[in-house]
Amino acid sequence: MVKVNGFSFVARSAGIRKSGKPDLGLIFSTVPARCAGVFTTNKVQAAPVLVTAPRIAAGECQAVLVNSGNANACTGEVGMQDALRCGQLAAKSLGIDEQLVAVSSTGVIGHPLPMPLLEKTIPGMSEGLSETAVDDVANAMMTTDSFAKVASRQAGDSAPYTILGVAKGAGMIHPNMATMLSFVMTDACVDQHFLQQALRQAVEGSFNIITVDRDTSTNDMVLVLANGESKTPEIVADSAEGQEFAELLRGVLLDLAKMIVRDGEGATKLVHVCVNGAADDGDARKVAYNVATSNLVKTAFFGEDANWGRIIAAVGYSEAQVDPSRIAIFFDGVPVVQKGLGTGPELEAQATDVLKQAEFSVTIDLGLGDGRGEYYTSDLTYEYVKINADYRT
Amino acid sequence: MVKVNGFSFVARSAGIRKSGKPDLGLIFSTVPARCAGVFTTNKVQAAPVLVTAPRIAAGECQAVLVNSGNANACTGEVGMQDALRCGQLAAKSLGIDEQLVAVSSTGVIGHPLPMPLLEKTIPGMSEGLSETAVDDVANAMMTTDSFAKVASRQAGDSAPYTILGVAKGAGMIHPNMATMLSFVMTDACVDQHFLQQALRQAVEGSFNIITVDRDTSTNDMVLVLANGESKTPEIVADSAEGQEFAELLRGVLLDLAKMIVRDGEGATKLVHVCVNGAADDGDARKVAYNVATSNLVKTAFFGEDANWGRIIAAVGYSEAQVDPSRIAIFFDGVPVVQKGLGTGPELEAQATDVLKQAEFSVTIDLGLGDGRGEYYTSDLTYEYVKINADYRT
């Protein structure tokens, strides 16, 4: 069980979810932590986002309260009051300033929070705090997730610290609106400005290669809290330590991001789409995005069909510079297309074996330049349709 | 049975499709027709597109040969030779110049056409031409389509002519790469330049509101042939007759486009997404597109769930100007959101009844300006996944 100095956790079943599953989690740091956040770019923002974003921008945070079962989105002024009230209840229970509490919600949109349940449950939560209960919080954040998502990294012996993250999210097929929440705790001491910069960068190389900025839900939120309780020297930008911290942070977020794809609603496969040889990185990313989000490509993955025709067509309708006669496509190492033409039935049969795996890569070489981009995606399955057709009913 | 003066049709089972279904169609005009075309914008273009586009641009066409079962795409130089050869065979059989033959293909990508079958079948086709066999051609164009798509309009008594169209296409869920073909025959006499302009406009208001430019397959093609055999006066731009022709042409294409959505792979519902009150038409179209292509919205339609939360979130992540507190959403006439807030369980129950219908509209009013846009979409179902996972195997 990974612990992080100064952090403790607790979860409860408040009854927001009718199933009676845990639906309320609390993360607490014994001292105020420096913090950074990345929030949804959706123009429709849920009340907890509106309440929390300015608090994080102020630079210090000591607790995160998260509920599942209700997004507190599209709930108007009542929703704002409810989000503030939840923060107050947590602050009072913990004996801290309410401005140091981040609040976060995920679940159905358009229904007010069941405040009587929260009024009853939040006040007693601080009593249950435990430094080993991070899994409970990860569990309480779940909506259609099929497993709790926790990842961590440790820094080396000379100045040891830990980065521990939890996340929630599963609807990444086309990533519209499937709320993604992630909270990262570290006992490192990190310069505030660098912390925000490192988080932004880490999100770009993790959550943003399973989703894209515009495809955000009303509630998306990634927070990092650095409380300095490792008592190691302050980590600043443009240093070896800063570089190491940034890499470890990205490692935690990428682990969580891959778990989200693997847990994509109904998904049975994790596919790494890599694009090389593009005119530039932007082009590479566009191509990777188009391939990774094509329903026809994703259903072919589910059908374990090495259908490179669908891939090459998705490459072609991207806005990237493309010369069809230079395209090469590989499933893991197996070339199925060279110079824009199929390589024949024998290699296609080998590629079909690759597709039978639970994890594989599709590499597309455009043969034009040095641009690179990547994306993680899953297959599109019967189960996806079932989950999303039945979600509210 | 709608007939168009001077046009005749024939279809055959050449054996390209292993099922033995008809897979080869021929459309013939007794005289060379003025023509116009809209072709895929995909950077990867199939051989028949490369062969046909310049012929149509030359302004005259007398025959269209179409096959299903094989797209002749990503087939390199061999594919080009095969496409040219098919045109030659048809031209010879019909006794016309090969430059007057358009060729078109749909089906799997990356396999050469089975030329021996085509060499054997095409030469005898002209013998079977019949002016009442348009349905046979529509039938021979089908791939995953579940029904043949034919629509027509007649112009008024003073100068009567007919517009008759066929189309193929069914994979419009996210419209990536699902080839869309349409051929329109009219005996009107139409100015060549105006014909191209009217076609472009009609496509914008029909096929392009079920798909978008970038989401084109390697093979997409819409052709119109106007042979003048109605012997009515030439129709030119900026005239009442031109206006009428443009409207009738759009009517035919919109009928065909709706059939394509209704036949969307596995689709059970046809949904008209209307956006009003946007800052401008471009914004309205962006919002309509985002809502119409959201997998989560579409699975909610399948689940007959009036889940306006998913709709409002899709509105929010569009790039359009949005003020959440002004959004209104209606299912047919039933308001489920006013000023960004839900209207309560009673109206939501009424909306759920609307969703039980096979056809309904979702109207989104952004409350900002006069911008309008629309889109037709379908639901996302188990059957979609099944069809696309199994398509090649």
Curated annotation (Swiss-Prot), chains A, B:
InterPro entries assigned:
Arg_biosynth_ArgJ, ArgJ-like_dom_sf, ArgJ_beta_C
Q: What is its EC number?
A: 2.3.1.35, 2.3.1.1
A Pfam family assignment: ArgJ
Where is this protein chiefly located? cytoplasm
Functional note: Catalyzes two activities which are involved in the cyclic version of arginine biosynthesis: the synthesis of N-acetylglutamate from glutamate and acetyl-CoA as the acetyl donor, and of ornithine by transacetylation between N(2)-acetylornithine and glutamate.
Please write the reaction equations for the catalytic activity of this protein: N(2)-acetyl-L-ornithine + L-glutamate = N-acetyl-L-glutamate + L-ornithine; L-glutamate + acetyl-CoA = N-acetyl-L-glutamate + CoA + H(+)
Q: Which Gene3D superfamilies match?
A: ArgJ beta chain, C-terminal domain, L-amino peptidase D-ALA esterase/amidase
Q: Any idea what this protein is called?
A: Arginine biosynthesis bifunctional protein ArgJ
Q: Which organism is it from?
A: Syntrophotalea carbinolica (strain DSM 2380 / NBRC 103641 / GraBd1)
Site description Cleavage, residues in chain: 178-179
What does the entry list as the binding residues for substrate?
143, 168, 179, 265, 388, 393
Q: Which GO MF terms does the UniProt record name? A: glutamate N-acetyltransferase activity; L-glutamate N-acetyltransferase activity
Question: What keywords is this UniProt entry annotated with?
Answer: Acyltransferase, Amino-acid biosynthesis, Arginine biosynthesis, Autocatalytic cleavage, Cytoplasm, Multifunctional enzyme, Transferase
Name the encoding gene, please: argJ
